[in-house]
Amino acid sequence: GMKQQAIVVERKVREILHIPLGSLTTTIPVTQRREPHMYEWLSRHRAFLEQVRNHPPKAVILGNSITHYWGGEPEHRNKNGREAWEKVMRPAGFQNLGCGWDRIENVLWRVYHGELDGYKAGKVVLMIGTNNCGLNSDRDIVEGLRFLLSAIRQRQPEASVKVIGILPRRNQEQWVRNINFDIKEMVETEGYEFANPGTALLLQDGKIDESLFIGDGLHPN
C-alpha cells in the first residue's frame, strides 16, 4: 500500500537527484566516526566543501588515511610522504579529499554531499577499498567501486577518472593481487583508467617491501 508507494517514489526521486541507493552495504552511503581521537570526519568534510568552493581544484584525489595523511590542505599533524605531495601532487593542482578509515560507502556519502559539485576538475583519482577488506566480499567491493565511479562520473562528466588499485598489505599480498585483477577488469570495462600500485611496493618474492611502509604493513612511508 502506502509504504510500497513511498518506496517507489523515493527510488524515483533518488534517480532524478543522482543519489541512488544500492542493495549492498558498499552501495549505501553512510557517515563514519571511526577515529575521533585523530580527527572529526564531518568537520573535515565541511572543510573540503569550503576548500573546493573557495579554490576550485584542477584535480582531486579521494581516499582513506593513505591519502588523508599524505599532504595538502586541510592540514593534518600526521604526515607520511609530504615531500612527494609537495613535489608531485601540489604542482599538478591536486586537492586532497582523503578521510582516515573511510570505506567505499563513506566516500559515496561525501560524493553525494557536494565534494565534487560546483567545479570542473580535469582529473579525479580514486584510491579506496582497503578498509572494506575482511568486511565485504570481493564482489561487493568491486560492485561498490562501480557504483561509486558512476556517481563520480555524473558529477564530473568531463574529468579523466583514474582508479588506483588496493595497495599491498602484509600477509594479504595474494588477496590484494587477486582483487586488483577484478577491479582492473571492471574499471577498464567501464571506460576508466586503472593503475596498479602493487609492483613498486613488493619484493621479488611477492611480499611487501617493509622498508617502504611505516611499520604497520599497510601505510606507505
Residue ranges and their predicted role:
Residues 59, 97-100, 138-145, 172-176, ...:
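Solvent-exposed, acidic/flexible segments
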Residues 68-90, 104-146, 151, 155, ...:
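Oxyanion-hole/transition-state-stabilizing segment in secreted/luminal serine hydrolases
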Residues 152-161, 185-193:
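A structural motif corresponding to the C-terminal end of an alpha-helix
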Residues 4, 8, 61, 102, ...:
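Extracytoplasmic/secreted proteins, especially bacterial periplasmic and envelope-associated proteins
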Residues 58-63, 93-98, 122-128, 132, ...:
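Structural recognition of the beta-strand scaffold that forms the well-ordered cores
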Residues 67, 101, 199:
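Short, glycine/acidic-enriched loop or turn micro-motifs at the edges of active sites
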Residues 2-3, 7, 170-221:
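Catalytic His-Asp segment of secreted/periplasmic serine-dependent ester chemistry enzymes
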Residues 1-62, 66-87:
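N-terminal secretory targeting modules
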